């Protein structure tokens, strides 16, 4: 994978709190459908209330026992996953045509950013070509799900910081029965700062690096403001 050369695209970053999944999904769709070749790219950093999402390739049988947790069928690639408190979710609305990126390279760059983020904690993450995401000793620590429309991507990644992993026992994570799932909090020494703020800051820095954004062209919208389309 070649790291992107610096470019002059404006990037808008929103660090949000807990956002309803359907609200974020509709907003991503609206921005992607209405953006122009001159529109800035966007990255949203947030978390969701507990929810299962089933991608376009998802099968109901992988929802083994959803219980009272809502299930939403969505337009991203991939199978079933869980989102909830304790995750760092990053949604990427990027103009791939402007960057000259294909889908495979997009996935590889996101995975590289996650792996580099884990490296700050002394955690060795790896990617698997047959199952997108990032893994530590065979257990999944980050999931990817993307959609490309009109040459632009949306959706993104979910990195497990310190969530209750019990919800993953109710599904076949990403469509793989028996897949183990892990989190940063279980892989670092006691007392390590694994706050969401720290993980988000590290992840954002690595995303800027792998996609070649000029830090001077990054604009933050504020701590809790939800951007309009």
Positions of predicted regions on the chain:
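A structural signal for short, well-ordered beta-strand segments
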Residues: 90-92, 132, 144-146, 157-161, ...
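Residues at secondary-structure transition points
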Residues: 61-64, 90, 151, 162, ...
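N-terminal lobe of the biotin/lipoate ligase/transferase fold
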Residues: 1-141, 170, 190-197, 224-229
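Short, conserved beta-strand/beta-arch hydrophobic-aromatic motifs that form part
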Residues: 56-63, 144-161, 165-166
């Amino acid at each position: 994978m070649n790291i992107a050369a610096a470019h002059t695209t404006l990037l808008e970053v929103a660090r949000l709190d807990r956002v309803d999944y359907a609200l974020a999904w509709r907003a991503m769709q609206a921005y992607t459908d209405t953006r122009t070749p001159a529109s800035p790219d966007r990255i949203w950093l947030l978390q969701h209330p507990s929810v299962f999402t089933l991608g376009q390739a998802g099968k109901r049988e992988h929802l083994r026992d959803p219980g009272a947790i809502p299930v939403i069928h969505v337009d991203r690639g991939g199978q079933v996953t869980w989102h909830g408190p304790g995750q760092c979710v990053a949604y990427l609305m990027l103009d791939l045509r402007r960057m000259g990126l294909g889908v495979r390279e997009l996935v590889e760059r996101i995975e590289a950013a996650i792996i580099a983020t884990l490296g700050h904690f002394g955690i060795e993450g790896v990617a698997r070509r047959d199952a997108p995401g990032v893994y530590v000793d065979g257990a999944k620590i980050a999931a990817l799900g993307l959609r490309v429309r009109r040459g632009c991507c949306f959706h993104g990644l979910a990195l497990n910081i310190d969530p209750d992993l019990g919800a993953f026992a109710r599904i076949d994570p990403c469509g793989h029965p028996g897949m183990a799932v892990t989190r940063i909090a279980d892989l670092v020494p006691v007392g390590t700062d694994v706050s969401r703020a720290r993980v988000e800051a590290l992840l954002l820095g690595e995303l800027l690096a792998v996609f070649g954004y000029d830090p001077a062209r990054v604009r933050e919208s504020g701590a809790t403001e939800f951007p309009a389309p």
